[in-house]
């Protein structure tokens, strides 16, 4: 195993804590009952990830979601619930990222739409941090028009940064993304969603910042 020089982090479920199940359950207030959730499970899951990734116009996705809600529901009502996907951002992780940048190149690679990202940037600012302080570069699906786990998004990030996959440690909480990164040559860590601190690899790189 080569010495680590670069760190690549997913955002949702890795840097920020997100409770996807509570978002789906919150849709009950808009008429998406338990029965509907069971019947339309695949569709609801697809629409949520489609909204997050930002490769389909948000208005198109929201309109499709609206068809599952009770009459009188507006897209604004849905957006208010989907804002919960911005999640809870532990300031301790942001503090750690700043320290990690003193020793490593640190990049963010996330499937996220423009609305959620701008709200996330605002949340970081409220906690006293800018993306420039936290990351050497940010790579987002909605801006790149590519999404994980497609090899193209890893290729473009590598070309733009000049990073060496063999010396890159990659953290992602979705198995297909972690595997795609591994196939690309990264040293991948499949993160237990919202529990980054439990992983030995995270603990080890943070120990290195104290040496």
Can you annotate each of these PLM segments?
Residues 105-107, 187:
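Proline-centered loop/turn at the N-terminus of a beta-strand
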């Amino acid at each position: 195993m080569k010495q680590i020089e670069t760190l690549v982090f997913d955002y949702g479920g890795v840097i920020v804590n997100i409770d996807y199940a509570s978002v789906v359950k919150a849709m009950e207030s808009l008429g998406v009952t338990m029965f509907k959730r069971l019947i339309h499970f695949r569709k609801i899951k697809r629409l949520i990830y489609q909204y997050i990734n930002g490769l389909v116009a948000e208005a198109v996705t929201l309109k499709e979601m609206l068809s599952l809600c009770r009459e009188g529901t507006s897209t604004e009502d849905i957006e208010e619930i989907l804002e919960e996907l911005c999640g809870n951002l532990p300031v301790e992780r942001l503090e750690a990222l700043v320290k990690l940048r003193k020793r490593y190149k640190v990049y963010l690679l996330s499937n996220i739409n423009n609305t959620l990202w701008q709200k996330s940037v605002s949340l970081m600012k409220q906690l006293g941090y800018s993306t420039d302080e936290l990351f050497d570069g940010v790579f987002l699906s909605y801006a790149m028009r590519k999404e994980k786990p497609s090899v193209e998004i890893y290729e473009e990030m590598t070309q733009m940064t000049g990073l060496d996959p063999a010396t890159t440690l990659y953290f992602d909480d979705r198995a297909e993304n972690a595997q795609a990164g591994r196939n690309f040559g990264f040293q991948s860590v499949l993160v237990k969603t919202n529990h980054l601190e439990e992983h030995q690899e995270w603990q080890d790189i943070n120990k290195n910042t104290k040496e």
